[in-house]
């Protein structure tokens, strides 16, 4: 049975804490984001070493491997989006269908150790990118096609919720 696509607009996490994982963007200091990314990436290695990493807990839920592959791609996508904000004036981000990507890239058939290495590399890259943004550039903006607008700061806050939430999903 295929996974039901997630169609929620998760930008609400910028306004109130996530009741599922406890993350609170409003309480997050921008300068903490790089360390949070690195800590999150490190926590995925033991999750991916589990013998059941590719086993879905039920037909409607991704396996830990699928969540990790998604997080790897989130790190890559947000690195690209941050680069766009810093390099262009109010860029429009390309749409990304995470569910179509999971199917097309066969997340659950990927090698867990390869995903762990790729996730760590992508995390290091996006952590370094967020760390390198000077305070004067943190109000630069970008937008999604649905009209959601982000500053560098709110992009960081919105972004870090995703890997945090998914680590909670797999109880990592």
Language model features with spans:
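Short, contiguous alpha-helical
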Residues: 1-15, 52-102, 138-172
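Short secondary-structure boundary micro-motifs
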Residues: 19, 29-31, 44-45, 67-69, ...
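Solvent-exposed interaction patches of small proteins and small membrane subunits
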Residues: 25-35, 88, 109-117
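A glycine-rich, hydrophobic loop/mini-helix early in the fold
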Residues: 33-62
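Acidic/histidine-rich alpha-helical segments that form the ligand environment
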Residues: 40, 45-47, 102-140, 159
């Amino acid at each position: 049975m295929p996974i039901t696509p997630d169609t929620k607009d998760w930008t609400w996490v910028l306004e109130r804490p996530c009741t599922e994982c406890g993350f609170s963007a409003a309480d997050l200091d921008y300068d903490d984001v790089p360390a949070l990314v690195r800590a999150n990436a490190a926590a995925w290695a033991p999750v991916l070493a589990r013998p059941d990493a590719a086993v879905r807990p039920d037909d409607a839920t991704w396996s830990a491997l699928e969540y990790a592959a998604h997080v790897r791609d989130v790190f890559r996508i947000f690195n690209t989006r941050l680069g766009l904000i810093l390099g262009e004036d109010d860029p429009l981000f390309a749409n990304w269908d995470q569910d179509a990507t999971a199917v097309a890239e066969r997340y659950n058939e990927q090698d867990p150790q390869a995903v762990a290495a790729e996730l760590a590399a992508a995390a290091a890259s996006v952590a370094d990118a967020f760390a390198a943004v000077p305070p004067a550039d943190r109000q630069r903006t970008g937008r999604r096609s649905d009209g959601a607008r982000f500053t560098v700061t709110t992009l960081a806050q919105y972004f870090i919720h995703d890997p945090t939430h998914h680590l909670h999903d797999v109880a990592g």
